[in-house]
Amino acid sequence: MKNHLSNVLCAMRSDFKDNHQETINKMIQFGTVKYGIVKQLKDRARSADKDIGSDQEENGGCSPLTTATTTASPSRSPEPEEEQPEEQSTSEQSIPEQSTPDHQLENDIKSEAKSEIEPVEDNNNRVAMTKPSSEEREPNASGSMPSSPVAEASAEEAATERTPEKEKEKDVEVDVEKPDEAPSSAVPSTEVTLPGGAGAPVTLEAIQNMQMAIAQFAAKTIANGSNGADNEAAMKQLAFLQQTLFNLQQQQLFQIQLIQQLQSQLALNQAKQEEDTEEDADQEQDQEQETDTYEEEERIADMELRQKAEARMAEAKARQHLINAGVPLRESSGSPAESLKRRREHDHESQPNRRPSLDNTHKADTAQDALAKLKEMENTPLPFGSDLASSIITNHDDLPEPNSLDLLQKRAQEVLDSASQGILANSMADDFAFGEKSGEGKGRNEPFFKHRCRYCGKVFGSDSALQIHIRSHTGERPFKCNVCGSRFTTKGNLKVHFQRHAQKFPHVPMNATPIPEHMDKFHPPLLDQMSPTDSSPNHSPAPPPLGSAPASFPPAFPGLQNLYRPPMEILKSLGAAAPHQYFPQELPTDLRKPSPQLDEDEPQVKNEPVEEKDQREEHEQEMAECSEPEPEPLPLEVRIKEERVEEQEQVKQEDHRIEPRRTPSPSSEHRSPHHHRHSHMGYPPVVQPIQPAALMHPQSSPGSQSHLDHLPTPGQLPPREDFFAERFPLNFTTAKMLSPEHHSPVRSPAGGALPPGVPPPPHHHPHHMARSPFFNPIKHEMAALLPRPHSNDNSWENFIEVSNTCETMKLKELMKNKKISDPNQCVVCDRVLSCKSALQMHYRTHTGERPFKCRICGRAFTTKGNLKTHMAVHKIRPPMRNFHQCPVCHKKYSNALVLQQHIRLHTGEPTDLTPEQIQAAEIRDPPPSMMPGHFMNPFAAAAFHFGALPGGPGGPPGPNHGAHNGALGSESSQGDMDDNMDCGEDYDDDVSSEHLSNSNLEQEGDRSRSGDDFKSLLFEQKLRIDATGVVNTNPVRPRSSASSHGHSVGSTSAPTSPSVHASSQVIKRSSSPARSEASQGALDLTPRAAPTSSSSSRSPLPKEKPVSPPSLPRSPSGSSHASANILTSPLPPTVGIDCLPPGLQHHLQQQHQHLMQQQAAVAAAAAAQHHHHQQMAALHQHQEQLRREAAEAQQKAAAAAAAAAAAAAAQRQTPPQARDQRQEGGPGAGPPPNPLMGARPPFGMFPNLPLFPPATTQNMCNAMNQIAQSVMPAAPFNPLALSGVRGSTTCGICYKTFPCHSALEIHYRSHTKERPFKCSICDRGFTTKGNLKQHMLTHKIRDMEQETFRNRAVKYMSEWNEDRE
């Protein structure tokens, strides 16, 4: 097979010269000589003649070329000529690859080159070829190298110069020995200069001892001169040599594989052309070829190993010389320039047969100097601009010492250099691998290589994926967490990481902009800004002395003033022992890996991070050591459940100091001593308005502590007192006190009021601060805690309450002995559910339990998903850019069409929207009770003409009068809409209604609800109905003696004009936000301020002399009890209840029954009614004027008839006790005749709208309910007032967008509380038909199959009793 391949190559030699000369020249220029020739041979071999013998005879001169060798001996070879045969024989023994087909192919190429060059021989058989003079004038240019990198990369196995003299000499001498003079040679090589080429010499030889050749060249180059431009050029050339050596080794393997493929293809083609008689011989040749292929692969592997071993030996010898020698580098005598010049002249004049001894000595000295200088060059930075020399891989030094920064950085740089070194190698491999496609216009520009990594060769589908992958090589992490400072390679990883901070720091947005590492000092993480010192924020300060009070903590957010300004920061004027100025939950968890403390002399570098597990264990140990004796100034989490401490030990500790708690409670250091006292006792912290002295000793109910142990765990809420007392310090205080000396912080134990205008002394409120006039605590509280719209924040779970009581208590007895075939089968209806959780939720349809309760509005739900959907209505509403104000009552609306409907309520005209819908669209102001004494905004001052708040009308105003009596309302957000739209009318909220009703069974003084204190604060402002049937919004809690000057029980229904009412009323403060009956139990957040001289002047009508109410007694013993009796007036069971929509009637009836049980003094209620009727008499004149302007004749007649019937019904239904009380009040105490009764609009079921008198008859309520029901179907809800046009699918109230109009209509029912689908059995209402169908399933079990269920229950109970016996 070898002879066959040689004959084929020889036969094609003459054809190449004539037909392919131009192709060979181009291939040599582009460095693809061998590949181009092999490709041409591959094409030509398919049409080769079978007669090989005749071709050998015709081209007989070619056959000697296959065995003869031409040795190109440089003129300045350090070895003498007589030693060359020995060296060649040694090389022939060590490298068997020279007899391979690759070697034969190479010889043919050399013979072709010789015949094409046609040199002129001299007597010594040498051919002298001189380079152009232009190259000689530019020795430092990159083009002055003897061969370009591309040409060298495309040469055979060793396209490099043989001796160092070739780099410096411009005259190249080629020794061409005739075939008969050199019978055998193991290292064939030749240097040719093509006539049509660029004049660059091309070396074609096999790689042999390349490492030693490069070492000799380096030694010669460095020995010529250590400085100057020549040395720099030599360094560049040396870099090229080492870079090319690596590329050629890779290229050699690839070319050998191509030759093997060519041989196999030639064998296959030859086998097809042979006759059938020669098939056996062909098969033997094929087997021999396969054997030769395997042998070739083994030889290739041996050659690689041998080359690597030689390289390692050379490196080891160089290191050994450097270690053992220790001699400074030998400098030549004279300047470097003179030495270089003299050496060049000596090289030109010297003969090739110089003495061996001198050459050997020179070789040894220069090699040792070159190795020493190479070692020195590795450890010193290269000159600027020597980019080629800097790319040399110098990963050959000893192993680095442990923890050595210099060696670590050097090793990293070498890795990067090695990675960049592979770029050229991969590029050349691509050229060869896809060389066939280059002719078709494709090659490396095709999409497959467009996003290919040059480090590892992976291919990606997009440029962005490639850039992200490259970061794995470079170690770049551009995305930085702005909270803890951690870095990430992708934005997605940062987003996932940032969710860990979202719950602790919800107001900080994620910074998705890439930040380079050198810009870290301009972008410090948030935790570093929050740290009081440069050390880690995990460590607590030193513990204070045992008897000293806790010192005030320094501000923890020094650089965060502009990012987030907490509402409590502006309340530091009193300078008392203030708690931490930020909310406890605002401190995020420190997720950073703390860097170890470095010495000052040690360079500040980025060390490898410590293992997270070890660091966390050390941190836990430190915290365990520090937690017992030290207080925690910066707690990281919030706890509700508190440990109980023995009473004696607690009282003893409270007398001396505040004991820091072992549990990481965030507010343990910030609470007042009063809170510590009752919290140590195990009582739940309760927020409550200020109580008079007589009621500060409540009796604890047995179930008052039953819910704190079952609070939700997802987001732990702070304790109630700490949750509100720190945020609303002037409005709330504790109700659970142990002794009379721990009464309200703002009032003395004797009950005496502080002088008006004098702030309470600091010892009365140890942790209370002054309040800014523009501070809205509800808005700031809810805005800081509720999640923002379209966010993934889970802080809404702070406002849910989960009842962990057993949901299947009613079914446990039946399930004990029931034999159920399926584990997920319902024991009641035998329905099989998909899983255990679905079965548990299914049981709630039988038991009616709703364990998930909203703490803001009190609604309960069967599943957590429904509660989460409900929490969306409490989220913050986008800010209103403008609003439309009513000229009469100064209410504000975002939609002008809704304002138009609202004005029709004033004029008595029929409206397209119900008052509920109009009320829902109103823009609320913060409640006046949450504001300080004399501050009212302009709208609030005008709106206080309304008089809708029936709080006490009399008494001189004081700075602390109204500021301490407010209850918590809804935040200025979507919660306004939710609370103003029938929080109580909840058809699917049985559990919530029953719980509220049962909570009212407690005594009036006992206001400490167990787990529902937050909810009870809201719902104690629920609708109260007085004896006249008017919805009363007075809180049931009695107020203190300073604020209990008198009460108007039914003042919301009396006035018909805000102007006259404002002029006729005395200056007063509201005790709670008004609950309009249109909202049916929700807080009316519209401010009702007392008119001042400026605000009351807005009224176009003349003022009237205000009626001064009688002053009530001020003693703490009598007034408190009297005020409690006044506020708990009796409620007739049938009067006024039907005036409300039917959804709230059941709840109000139960509430009325509890109020009747709590009634203690009927005379006080009669006195309040007497005062109410006096106000009605004062407003009678303006009512007559309004009736003449607004009423029409037809409405007068219709309403007059209804008024007559209503008066008769009221006379019959009024309780005799209340009637006697009216008579006892005197002749002037009775209500005067109301001529405006006939001018009422057809919505009389909303009596607390301040414009109309109360509806006091059952017939009147029924008539108006019928009118409302007849109007509602004809006028569907259309907030945009677009007749016949389907408007946008965006909600006009909360600005949510829905996919269709029907979904929007269903959504509007959540605002309007409209439930059009009624159950025919229990009369419950539902918003959708699907909910009604689901509800009907419960009746199918409970009612329609009641007999079956009863029999089954009896059977189960009998079986259970038998088993029990």
UniProtKB/Swiss-Prot annotation:
Biased segments, Polar residues type: 530-539, 1055-1079
Biological processes per GO annotation: antennal joint development; compound eye photoreceptor cell differentiation; glial cell development; imaginal disc-derived wing vein morphogenesis; male genitalia development; male gonad development; muscle organ morphogenesis; negative regulation of terminal cell fate specification, open tracheal system
InterPro entries attached to this UniProt entry: Sal_C2H2-zinc-finger, Znf_C2H2_sf, Znf_C2H2_type
Compartments reported by the entry: Nucleus
Comp. bias intervals (Acidic residues): 275-298, 976-991
Chain positions covered by the region annotation Disordered: 47-194, 270-298, 322-363, 508-554, 586-716, 740-772, 948-1012, 1030-1129, 1146-1241
Basic and acidic residues composition bias: residue spans: 103-117, 159-181, 346-363, 603-622, 638-662, 1181-1191
Zinc finger (C2H2-type): 451-473, 479-501, 824-846, 852-874, 884-906, 1289-1311, 1317-1339
Positions with biased composition (Low complexity): 63-76, 87-99, 146-157, 1040-1054, 1085-1100, 1114-1123, 1146-1168, 1192-1218
Family: Belongs to the sal C2H2-type zinc-finger protein family.
Protein name per UniProt: Homeotic protein spalt-major
Source organism: Drosophila melanogaster
